[in-house]
C-alpha cells in the first residue's frame, strides 16, 4: 500500500526544516496547524476514498512540500506555501477560520525542527482582505497583500529574528494585528526568510534567499476603516531587485554591513510596525510612531505555559518570542539577551561554540566557504 510507505518517510522528511504546530490569536485556544501528517492522510484518502480517513480540519493553509522546504518567489506557492495542494484538498478538509480582534497578538508555534541553526534571516507578516467576508478556497495569488510587520537584524545583540526564534525555549513567535483595519475576512501571511545561502551580488536561483511562508485565515472584529492602498500580489511582491539577492550576509557581517539590510518587497503600511535596523538606522516604528532604538526588537514575557493569558498584551513587545521568567519591567533589549541565555541554560557558551562549528559543517555554501577561506 502507498500510505504506509509514505508514513515511514515522514520522520526523515520532517527533520529537513519544520512546520507550525498551532496558532493562537489573542486569548483564544491553540488552533492546530496543517502538517505533513495531514498531507499524507489526505493523499491516502485521495487514493482510497472508501477506507482512507478524512484529514481533520486545520487552521493554516495547506502545503505539499514534503521536505518542508522554501517556496520559489516566482511560483504561486510563495503566497501561502502550497498553491496546488490547497486547490486539491480543500474540498476534503476546508481550512478553519480563526476569530480575531483588532490589536490581538498572534502566537505561532514552530516545531522543534525549525528553524534549525544556520538559517539566519528576517521575519515578516502580511495581510490581505478576502472578498465577500470569506477566505474559504480563495486563491491567495489574486489578493492584494499589504505588509503589517517587518522584523530585521538587531544590531544591539547582533542577531537575526530567526536566530532569536531558534534560541528561544519554546520556539514561539509573536506578532500584533493592526488596529485600524476594517472588519472582515483576512488572510494573514507569516514568513521566515533564511539568508545563509544567498551569495550575491549576481542573482542565482541555486544560491538564493529562502522564503518559508505560512497562511492563516482569520475573521477580524474591528472598528477601523483604513484599508491600505500600498499593496502587491504574490508572486510579484518579491523580485531580483530586492536587496537580499545582491548581498552575502557572511561578507556583510565581516564588513559590518548587516545594518544596511533592506527588507524585500513593499514597505510596511502606516498602521503596521518595523523592528531592528534598516539601511543603517533604527527602524523601531509601531503604528506609524517612532519609538526608542532600545525597543527595536523584543521578546514577550510570559509564564512557562504555552497558552496566552489575558495580560499577555501588557508584557509583550512588538516583535519576539515567548521568553520564560523574563520580567515584564525589563527593557526589550535586555529581555532578548535574557531569553537567549535562558533558552540555552548554563551551557550557553559551550553550545554556541559547538553550534558554530556544526553550522559550518552542515552549511557548506559557496559564499560561506569563500568567506572562511579569505578571512
UniProtKB/Swiss-Prot annotation:
Summary of the knockout phenotype: Impairs virulence in mouse lungs and in Galleria mellonella models.
EC number(s) on file: 1.14.99.56
Cofactor note: Binds 1 copper ion per subunit.
UniProt feature, compositional bias: Basic residues: 347-369
Composition bias type Low complexity, residue spans: 290-341
GO biological process: cellulose catabolic process
GO terms, molecular function: metal ion binding; monooxygenase activity
Subcellular location: Secreted, Cell wall
Record keywords, A-Z: Carbohydrate metabolism, Cell wall, Cellulose degradation, Copper, Disulfide bond, Glycoprotein, Metal-binding, Monooxygenase, Oxidoreductase, Polysaccharide degradation, Secreted, Signal
Residues holding O2: 196
GO cellular component: extracellular region
Entry cofactors: Cu(2+)
Chain spans, region Disordered: 287-375
Amino-acid positions noted as binding Cu(2+) in the UniProt annotation, renumbered to this chain: 119, 212
Superkingdom of the organism of origin: Eukaryota
Pfam families to which the protein is assigned, alphabetical: AA9
Signal sequence bounds: 1-16
Catalysis: reaction(s): [(1->4)-beta-D-glucosyl]n+m + reduced acceptor + O2 = 4-dehydro-beta-D-glucosyl-[(1->4)-beta-D-glucosyl]n-1 + [(1->4)-beta-D-glucosyl]m + acceptor + H2O
Family affiliation: Belongs to the polysaccharide monooxygenase AA9 family.
Name assigned to this protein: AA9 family lytic polysaccharide monooxygenase CEL1
Taxonomic source organism: Cryptococcus neoformans var. grubii serotype A (strain H99 / ATCC 208821 / CBS 10515 / FGSC 9487)
Gene that this sequence comes from: CEL1
Amino acid at each position: 500500500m502507498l500510505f504506509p510507505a509514505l508514513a515511514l518517510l515522514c520522520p526523515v522528511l520532517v527533520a529537513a526544516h519544520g512546520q507550525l504546530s498551532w496558532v493562537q490569536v489573542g486569548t483564544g485556544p491553540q488552533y492546530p496547524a496543517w502538517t505533513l501528517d495531514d498531507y499524507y492522510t489526505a493523499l491516502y484518502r485521495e487514493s482510497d476514498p472508501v477506507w482512507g480517513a478524512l484529514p481533520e480540519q486545520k487552521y493554516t493553509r495547506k502545503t505539499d512540500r514534503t521536505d518542508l522546504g522554501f517556496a520559489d518567489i516566482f511560483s504561486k506557492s510563495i503566497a501561502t506555501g502550497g498553491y496546488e495542494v490547497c486547490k486539491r484538498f480543500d474540498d476534503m478538509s476546508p481550512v478553519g477560520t480563526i476569530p480575531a480582534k483588532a490589536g490581538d497578538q498572534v502566537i505561532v508555534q514552530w516545531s522543534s525542527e525549525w528553524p534549525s541553526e544556520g538559517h539566519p534571516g528576517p521575519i515578516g507578516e502580511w495581510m490581505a482582505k478576502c472578498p465577500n467576508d470569506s477566505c474559504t478556497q480563495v486563491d491567495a495569488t489574486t489578493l492584494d497583500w499589504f505588509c503589517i510587520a517587518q522584523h530585521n537584524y538587531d544590531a544591539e545583540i547582533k542577531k537575526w529574528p530567526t536566530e532569536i526564534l531558534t534560541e528561544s525555549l519554546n520556539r514561539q513567535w509573536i506578532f500584533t494585528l493592526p488596529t485600524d483595519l476594517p472588519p472582515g475576512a483576512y488572510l494573514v501571511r507569516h514568513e521566515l526568510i533564511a539568508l545563509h545561502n544567498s551569495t550575491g551580488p549576481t542573482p542565482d536561483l541555486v544560491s538564493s534567499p529562502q522564503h518559508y511562508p505560512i497562511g492563516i485565515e482569520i475573521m477580524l472584529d474591528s472598528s477601523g476603516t483604513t484599508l491600505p492602498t500600498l499593496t502587491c500580489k504574490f508572486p510579484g511582491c518579491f523580485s531580483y531587485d530586492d536587496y537580499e539577492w545582491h548581498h552575502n550576509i557572511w561578507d556583510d557581517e565581516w564588513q559590518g554591513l548587516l545594518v544596511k539590510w533592506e527588507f524585500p518587497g513593499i514597505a510596511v503600511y502606516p498602521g503596521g510596525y518595523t523592528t531592528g535596523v534598516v539601511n543603517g538606522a533604527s527602524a523601531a516604528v509601531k503604528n506609524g510612531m517612532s519609538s526608542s532604538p532600545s525597543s527595536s526588537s523584543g521578546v514577550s514575557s510570559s509564564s512557562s505555559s504555552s497558552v496566552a493569558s489575558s495580560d499577555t498584551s501588557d508584557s509583550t513587545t512588538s516583535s519576539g518570542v515567548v521568553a520564560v521568567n523574563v520580567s515584564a519591567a525589563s527593557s526589550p533589549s535586555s529581555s532578548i539577551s535574557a531569553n537567549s541565555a535562558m533558552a540555552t541554560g548554563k551551557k550557553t557558551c559551550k553550545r554556541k561554540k559547538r553550534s558554530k562549528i556544526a553550522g559550518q559543517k552542515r552549511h557548506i555554501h559557496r559564499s560561506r566557504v569563500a568567506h572562511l577561506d579569505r578571512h
